């Protein structure tokens, strides 16, 4: 019998949002193949989004958004929808971080999301 594995769903991390036309926007993803719920940072120089990286110094070290659906930017920039502001509440267990983050780094990312109105519960 084949074993099926359910992957993340677009918007599956979202618990509540006030106004979807206000909280979500189409953004440009600069690099990587990212899953729904990936925490994003914004590159200061280009204004493009990429996976949050606390070790970076290009702007992506600060968590500012959450990717709505899968985005494959492995061959170049792609447009994708992201939750970029609140009021909204997301499930912390459904957020995706790239790399291996420490608990303090995850807590800092959660706090940065709260700063833009995205509550992490």
Where are the language model's segments positioned?
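Surface-exposed, low-hydrophobicity beta-strand/loop segments enriched in small/polar/acidic residues
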Residues: 1-121
